[in-house]
């Protein structure tokens, strides 16, 4: 990057700083993996966002963490591949495209499958472009030369191969099962696509008559319309109330079908009446009970949520209309004995909002137990296991794997990977293969597509060229080093990538999984459309810049924890960047056209020089160690404290002494140290704030084209000086103590005062004498005395620091008579306040009627006034000493 400006602009403007830099990085190909065999590879594949719209704050957080990792590793000399890509997001994208078509007054059926898919691809191209623009705004160092999409030809080949191989191993089968069914979109849903909401419903209590006429058995349901498909009534085998009824039958009300009373341990004896209706075609638990007892499965609904011919006279009714009509009929028949209001959790489709129906359907499934077994066994092998950060999420993962159910992988959609299965038109024979049958005219392909998570589970290796195991990228960059993702998709995605990676590559797909939480608002609420508390990251970037947003997101919480988003804290980060900018301007204005090769750290150094270089070493060690542990918050805090406190507030101020002095050698050393420390600090900060660090670094004396490929700082033992650091700590303590004393008595720093320091021994005396110029510069004494045998003066403000005692005579600081009068007036004011609040708190009427928070507030005031009064009394006493 050519740079003709000697100095940075006067004001930090994030928009002008970030403008154009990303494109310059892309043109320089700094983010492209080189394949350099001399370097160790480091690989991350991006969790692919859905091509359904804009990225949200969760995406910004997730990708910022990945960018921090990959930028750091690139600077540390790794051959970094951060592979970008997007997910076709089957149902989500299809719902969006269908919604757009509805606005035009047409449906997907009007278009037909091929034309509809053309529309879906048009949508994908438009929104993929938006997502790339947003990635650029955040500053993500992605290798676009390797960008992938889950419906790419190569990835589709991988999907088909995996399906066929699992089918041939008997691990994919077609069968009936209860799935989450969305009647509005007419497709199966994964658990993650079901949103549970608290809904006001009811328990419908009914009497089912015993067929022999000897009485009835009472039970309750929240879905009375499903009783039309009941095939049994169940009780617990050890429930003494019903043991005598096991094996008998009841007559299903309205329907008149005779069904058995069975015993099953699924029933909870102590819940309700201890009797449950069993509807195997409309409830997952009932389905399992039905399998154990060989019960028939009677499906009483159509795919659109209307009742079918098995529902008798309710055939054709919407399921909820059927509920109303059936309840009325049950009441009239005297079967319904009570309707008990009941709030309960009901699943709704994330896409359509429709109430999800547990529904018996013929679907394709993956047999999970054998696959999960291998994944669980892997975690026993210390060198080969997947490491979860934080570690507690490994238990979450293992618990799910050990209690896993078969996975429904078919979806009744058009957008997605079409299932590679064909049915013979005459014989019904099923053919599964990566290629269509040779006599294709005699076969019909399965209309369904695969669950989006099926292709996503192959993402770490399909994106690198598998199933071609000789592909250069697959051989070099697999398995990947880290996956960064939220805890909400450990089950749906992380676990599936692990077992598919093991099954098809024989290796874990990634070494580490860094888990983060969810982005919440300042009140801790989940961001959602209904609450209206969502925040667009692009708006944050426009207002405060990507660097400020990134630093807040990456340092605002610990691994595995949720993040409370605060615009105020992003603004504070912007202020921090502004301070860095101003400090950098000061450094650059004092460089005197210094070239990179002129930076010389071998000259004689002051205690401040040695200290800042030692603190830089400590910061390099801390940042590097915490980055290796994924503790980005700790790394960021180390940098913040070093830059704000050590470099800006102390060293730059101390550097002004030699810079504005006459000693040319000292000036040169100071310039070199300023340039070196700022250069190293910008490198450490670069993964967090890529834009502003590149801008500043380009103005500094440097070698190389871009900070993105500059070497990561390392600790230099030759610049470590513990003694100088201790000396500096003493100086800082003295200066701070003097400033505190002046603030306490309202004496400005501009007023000169006597200052006496009693050193505890000759060594401290020598240190303070040698560094007295700093004390004179920052404490502004009219006279400075440093001795080991100093007698404490009368009427002086004092402070004790490690190794020394300070005295500032009061007569120099204040007019004693005026200060005494002022303090007495203060004391009188606090006496009145204490009396007022204590009188209020002793009033029994007030205490009895006032809210607890108000009383607590008054007690806090009392404590505050008492402490302030005591401080004033102490100050008055000090004046009399």
Swiss-Prot record:
Sequence motif 'HIGH' region, location on chain: 49-59
A cellular component annotation (GO) from this entry: cytosol
GO MF, one example: aminoacyl-tRNA deacylase activity
Cross-referenced InterPro entries: aa-tRNA-synth_I_CS (IPR001412), aa-tRNA-synth_Ia (IPR002300), Anticodon_Ia_Val (IPR033705), M/V/L/I-tRNA-synth_anticd-bd (IPR013155), Rossmann-like_a/b/a_fold (IPR014729), tRNA-bd_arm (IPR010978), tRNAsynth_Ia_anticodon-bd (IPR009080), Val-tRNA_synth_C_sf (IPR037118)
Protein's UniProt keywords contain Protein biosynthesis: yes
Residues reported to bind ATP: 529
Segments forming a coiled coil: 810-881
Subcellular location: Cytoplasm
Enzyme class, spelled out: ligase
UniProt keywords, alphabetically: Aminoacyl-tRNA synthetase, ATP-binding, Coiled coil, Cytoplasm, Ligase, Nucleotide-binding, Protein biosynthesis
Catalytic activity reported: tRNA(Val) + L-valine + ATP = L-valyl-tRNA(Val) + AMP + diphosphate
Motif mapping: 'KMSKS' region: 526-530
EC number from the UniProt entry: 6.1.1.9
Gene Ontology BP terms: valyl-tRNA aminoacylation
Function of the protein: Catalyzes the attachment of valine to tRNA(Val). As ValRS can inadvertently accommodate and process structurally similar amino acids such as threonine, to avoid such errors, it has a 'posttransfer' editing activity that hydrolyzes mischarged Thr-tRNA(Val) in a tRNA-dependent manner.
Family: Belongs to the class-I aminoacyl-tRNA synthetase family. ValS type 1 subfamily.
Subunit note: Monomer.
Domains as described in the record: ValRS has two distinct active sites: one for aminoacylation and one for editing. The misactivated threonine is translocated from the active site to the editing site. The C-terminal coiled-coil domain is crucial for aminoacylation activity.
Protein's recorded name: Valine--tRNA ligase
Species in which this protein is naturally found: Bacillus cereus (strain ATCC 10987 / NRS 248)
């Amino acid at each position: 990057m050519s740079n003709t400006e000697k100095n940075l602009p006067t004001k930090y403007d994030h928009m002008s700083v970030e403008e154009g830099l990303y494109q310059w990085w892309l043109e320089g190909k700094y983010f492209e993996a080189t394949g350099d065999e001399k370097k160790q590879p480091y690989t991350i594949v991006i969790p692919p966002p859905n091509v359904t719209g804009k990225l949200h704050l969760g995406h910004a957080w997730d990708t910022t963490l990945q960018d921090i990792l990959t930028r750091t590793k690139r600077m540390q000399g790794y051959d970094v591949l951060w592979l970008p890509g997007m997910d076709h997001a089957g149902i989500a994208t299809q719902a969006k495209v269908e919604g757009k078509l509805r606005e035009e007054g047409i449906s997907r059926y009007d278009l037909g499958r091929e034309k509809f898919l053309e529309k879906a691809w048009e949508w994908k191209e438009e929104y993929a472009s938006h997502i790339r623009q947003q990635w650029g705004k955040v500053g993500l160092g992605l290798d676009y030369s390797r960008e992938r999409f889950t419906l790419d030809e190569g990835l589709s080949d991988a999907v088909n191969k995996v399906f066929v191989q699992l089918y041939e191993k008997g691990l994919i089968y077609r069968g009936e099962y209860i799935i989450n069914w969305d009647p509005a979109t007419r497709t199966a849903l994964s658990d993650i696509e079901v949103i549970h909401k608290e809904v006001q419903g009811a328990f419908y209590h009914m009497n089912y008559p015993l067929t022999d006429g000897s009485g009835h058995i009472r039970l309750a349901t929240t879905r009375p319309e499903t009783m039309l498909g009941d095939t049994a009534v169940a009780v617990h085998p050890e429930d003494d109330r019903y043991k005598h009824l096991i094996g008998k039958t009841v007559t299903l009300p309205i329907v008149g079908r005779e069904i058995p009373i069975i015993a099953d341990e699924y029933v909870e004896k102590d819940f309700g009446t201890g009797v449950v209706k069993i509807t195997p075609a409309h409830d997952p638990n009932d389905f399992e009970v039905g399998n154990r007892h060989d019960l028939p499965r009677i499906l009483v609904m159509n795919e659109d949520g209307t009742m079918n011919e098995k529902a008798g006279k309710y055939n054709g009714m919407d399921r909820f209309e059927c509920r109303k009509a059936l309840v009325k009929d049950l009441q009239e028949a005297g079967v319904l004995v009570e309707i008990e209001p009941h709030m309960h959790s009901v699943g709704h489709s994330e896409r359509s909002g429709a109430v999800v129906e547990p529904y018996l359907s013929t679907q394709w499934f993956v047999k999970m137990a054998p696959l999960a077994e291998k994944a669980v066994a892997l975690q026993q092998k210390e060198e080969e296991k997947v490491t979860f950060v934080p570690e507690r999420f490994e238990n979450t993962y293992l618990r799910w794997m050990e209690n896993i159910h078969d996975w429904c992988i078919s979806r009744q959609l058009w957008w997605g990977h079409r299932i590679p299965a064909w049915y013979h038109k005459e014989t019904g024979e099923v053919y599964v293969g990566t290629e269509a049958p040779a006599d294709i005219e005699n076969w019909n392909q399965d209309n369904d597509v695969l669950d989006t998570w099926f292709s996503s589970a192959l993402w770490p290796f399909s994106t690198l060229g598998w199933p071609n195991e000789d592909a250069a990228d697959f051989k070099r960059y697999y398995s990947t080093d880290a996956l960064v993702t939220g805890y909400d998709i450990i089950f749906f995605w992380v676990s599936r990538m692990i077992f598919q990676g093991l099954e098809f590559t024989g290796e874990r797909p990634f070494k580490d999984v860094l888990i983060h939480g969810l982005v919440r608002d300042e009140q801790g609420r989940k961001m959602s459309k209904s609450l209206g508390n969502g925040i667009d990251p692009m708006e944050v970037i426009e207002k405060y810049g990507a660097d400020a947003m990134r630093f807040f997101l990456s340092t605002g919480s610990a691994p595995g924890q949720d993040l409370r988003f605060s615009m105020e804290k992003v603004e504070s980060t912007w202020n921090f960047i502004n301070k860095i900018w101003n400090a950098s301007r000061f450094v650059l204005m004092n460089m005197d056209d210094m070239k990179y090769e002129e930076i010389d750290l071998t000259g004689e150094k002051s205690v401040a020089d040695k200290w800042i270089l030692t603190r830089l070493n400590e910061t390099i060690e801390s940042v590097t160690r915490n980055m290796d542990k994924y503790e980005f918050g700790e790394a960021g805090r180390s940098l913040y404290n070093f830059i704000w406190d050590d470099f800006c507030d102390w060293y730059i101020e101390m550097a002004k002494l030699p810079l504005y002095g006459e000693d040319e050698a000292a000036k040169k050393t100071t310039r070199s140290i300023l340039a070196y420390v700022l250069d190293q600090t910008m490198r450490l900060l670069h993964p967090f704030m890529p834009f502003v660090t590149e801008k500043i670094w380009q103005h500094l004396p440097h070698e190389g084209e871009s900070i993105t490929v500059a070497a990561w700082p390392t600790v230099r033992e030759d610049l470590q000086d513990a003694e100088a650091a201790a000396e500096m700590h003493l100086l800082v303590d003295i200066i701070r103590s003097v400033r505190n004393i002046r603030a306490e008595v309202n004496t400005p720093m501009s007023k000169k005062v006597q200052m006496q320091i009693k050193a505890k021994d000759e060594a401290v005396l020598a240190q303070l004498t040698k560094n007295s110029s700093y004390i004179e510069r920052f404490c502004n004494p009219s006279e400075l005395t440093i001795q080991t045998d100093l007698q404490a003066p009368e009427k002086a403000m004092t402070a004790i620091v490690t190794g020394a005692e300070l005295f500032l005579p009061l007569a120099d600081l204040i007019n004693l008579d005026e200060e005494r009068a002022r303090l007495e007036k203060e004391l009188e004011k606090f006496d009145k306040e204490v009396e007022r609040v204590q009188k209020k708190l002793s009033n029994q009427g007030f205490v009895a009627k006032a809210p607890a928070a108000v009383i607590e507030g008054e007690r806090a005031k009392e404590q505050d006034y008492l402490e302030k009064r005591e401080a004033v009394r102490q100050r008055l006493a000090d004046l009399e000493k």
